[in-house]
């Protein structure tokens, strides 16, 4: 499988052979499983204080008094029991609960390969809602892209590649979240836009990540979370030449 390599002016400069991973079969079932495993692995176990609602002098005086046999404080009102104000919860969250959905190692690797191959499928990328003008996927740029230090320079390259509209789509799609998440450090819901995969740590990482919805990752750290947000593959992805070399080393 061959692909076109573009320079920073959006001009096709050569054709290269893609790594074999781009010919992997599309497996949405494995991608979903691997995403849920990676997502739940990030969740922090939570639980209540074992003594919550139990710090009281209330006691049960037993039957024969013509009233409910609940624990009561000397003043007469109920305490400790779940149906009482200030009482314990009946079934509070427990830290022992298993949150992480495990997935087999070979399944996870196959899912990542399948999600990588999905980035080269224009139909899957469009189904995911991305906006772009080019039909030549995957989008590969010269390694000189990694030397860019300014966000405006990165956006200029995106414009020349015909994918800048997707960044604008993400910017216009930022909404205030409904519910209590607003009070918990996640006020805004932000659409996912372009994924940039580079060969190693470089200036372009800092230059690219300020664009709305854009994520930047090295080929070594590339995972299903980046390739298939929400468990849906087909993310619009820009690869550098050096990233493809690292990808070949990783999977072949």
From Swiss-Prot:
Coiled coil: none annotated. This is Large ribosomal subunit protein uL4. It comes from Methanocaldococcus jannaschii (strain ATCC 43067 / DSM 2661 / JAL-1 / JCM 10045 / NBRC 100440) (Methanococcus jannaschii). Pfam families: Ribosomal_L4. GO terms for biological process: translation. Belongs to the universal ribosomal protein uL4 family. Keywords: Ribonucleoprotein, Ribosomal protein, RNA-binding, rRNA-binding. One of the primary rRNA binding proteins, this protein initially binds near the 5'-end of the 23S rRNA. It is important during the early stages of 50S assembly. It makes multiple contacts with different domains of the 23S rRNA in the assembled 50S subunit and ribosome. NCBIfam families: rpl4p_arch. One of its GO terms (cellular component) is cytosolic large ribosomal subunit. One of its GO terms (molecular function) is structural constituent of ribosome. It comes from the Archaea. HAMAP family: Ribosomal_uL4_A (MF_01328_A). Part of the 50S ribosomal subunit.
């Amino acid at each position: 499988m061959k692909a076109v390599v573009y320079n920073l002016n959006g001009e096709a400069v050569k054709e290269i052979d893609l790594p074999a991973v781009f010919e992997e079969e599309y497996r949405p079932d494995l991608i979903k499983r691997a995403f849920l495993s990676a997502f739940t692995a990030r969740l922090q176990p939570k639980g209540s204080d074992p003594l919550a609602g139990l710090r009281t002098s209330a006691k049960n005086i037993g039957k024969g008094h013509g009233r409910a046999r609940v624990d009561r404080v000397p003043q007469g009102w109920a305490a400790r029991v779940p149906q009482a104000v200030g009482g314990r919860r009946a079934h509070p969250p427990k830290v022992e609960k298993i949150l992480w959905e495990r997935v087999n190692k070979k399944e996870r690797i196959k899912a990542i390969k399948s999600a990588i191959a999905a980035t080269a499928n224009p139909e899957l990328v469009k189904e995911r809602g991305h906006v772009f003008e080019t039909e030549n996927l995957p989008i590969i740029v010269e390694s000189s892209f990694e030397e860019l230090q300014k966000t405006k320079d990165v956006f200029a390259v995106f414009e020349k590649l015909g994918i800048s509209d997707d960044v604008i789509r993400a910017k216009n799609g930022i909404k205030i979240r409904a519910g209590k998440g607003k009070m918990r450090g996640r006020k805004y819901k932000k659409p996912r836009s372009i994924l940039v995969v580079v060969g190693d740590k470089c200036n372009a990482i800092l230059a690219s990540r300020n664009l709305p919805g854009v994520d930047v990752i090295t080929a070594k750290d590339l995972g299903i979370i980046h390739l298939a947000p929400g468990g849906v593959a087909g993310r619009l992805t820009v690869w550098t030449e050096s990233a493809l070399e690292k990808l070949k080393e990783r999977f072949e």
